[in-house]
Swiss-Prot record:
It comes from Pseudomonas putida (strain ATCC 700007 / DSM 6899 / JCM 31910 / BCRC 17059 / LMG 24140 / F1). The keyword Transmembrane helix does not apply. It is an enzyme of class 3 (hydrolase). Residues 1-11 have a biased composition (Acidic residues). Gene3D superfamilies: Ribonuclease H-like superfamily/Ribonuclease H. Keywords: Exonuclease, Hydrolase, Magnesium, Metal-binding, Nuclease, tRNA processing. Transmembrane segments: none annotated. The keyword Hydrolase applies. This is Ribonuclease T. One of its GO terms (molecular function) is nucleic acid binding. Belongs to the RNase T family. Homodimer. Its EC number is 3.1.13.-. PANTHER family: DNA POLYMERASE III SUBUNIT EPSILON, RIBONUCLEASE T.
């Protein structure tokens, strides 16, 4: 399937008046960082347990910054598989009295609402998922969308930006904690494997790599 099928949505050419710099930077796509914590590796059968998303903003000089975080603990869908090893790895306690999980539909609807608001504010037409090993997060997001028959999914269905790849290029590191350390981003291993924490650190890493590229002369906005 070709990305060209989605180009008409972006309206990247021929629009009247100046476009928002963010829309210009990524051809009408808005980067949104997403991380999920799950009950296993299979997006079709394993539970989505946490999801977080960070929208990305751009300052007047064209530098990116993490803007707003959305986070939900999620109730496993009916019949979902949850591997004990996954719970041990993430430290998630499903029966914790303060977990306060919501349904997949509620979590996704809230995040999509926030993303659409950011799209409008930045003059973008579609979000593109940014993740550390992004195909994993996009797979679980798409599976939740399909299970709940959600309409108006703002994310591109198959394209993404992978910070594991970007960090490998920029710093020679593909593990999130090590990439953050190389980028002088504080990383507390005790907080890792929380969707909120990992998403916020991934957002810092993504913004840092893109901004570093700009500082090196790799991209100039249309006002330069």
């Amino acid at each position: 399937m070709s990305e060209d099928l989605y180009e008409d949505d972006l309206d990247t050419q021929g629009s009247s008046g100046p476009r928002h710099p963010m829309a210009e930077r990524f051809r009408g796509y808005l980067p949104v960082v997403v991380d999920v914590e799950t009950g296993g590796f299979n997006s079709a059968t394993d539970a989505l347990l946490e999801i977080a998303a960070v929208t990305i903003g751009m300052d007047e000089k064209g530098f990116l910054f993490p803007e707003h975080t959305y986070f939900h603990r999620v109730e496993p869908f009916e019949g979902a598989n949850i591997e004990p090893a996954a719970l041990e790895f993430t430290g998630i306690k499903l029966d914790h009295p303060l977990r306060m999980a919501v349904s997949e539909e509620s979590a996704m609807t809230d995040i999509f609402r926030g993303v659409r608001k950011a799209l409008k504010a930045n003059g973008c037409k579609r979000a593109i998922l940014v993740g550390h090993n992004s195909s994993f997060d996009l797979g679980f997001l798409n599976a939740a969308v399909a299970r709940n028959d959600l309409k108006r999914n703002p994310f591109h269905p198959f394209s993404s930006f992978d910070t594991a790849t970007l960090a490998g290029l920029a710093y020679g590191q593909t593990v999130l904690a090590r990439a953050c350390q190389s980028a002088d981003i504080d990383f507390d291993g005790r907080e890792a494997h929380s969707a909120r924490y990992d998403t916020e650190k991934t957002a810092e890493l993504f913004c840092g790599i893109v901004n570093r590229w700009k500082e090196m002369g790799g991209w100039r906005d249309f006002n330069d």
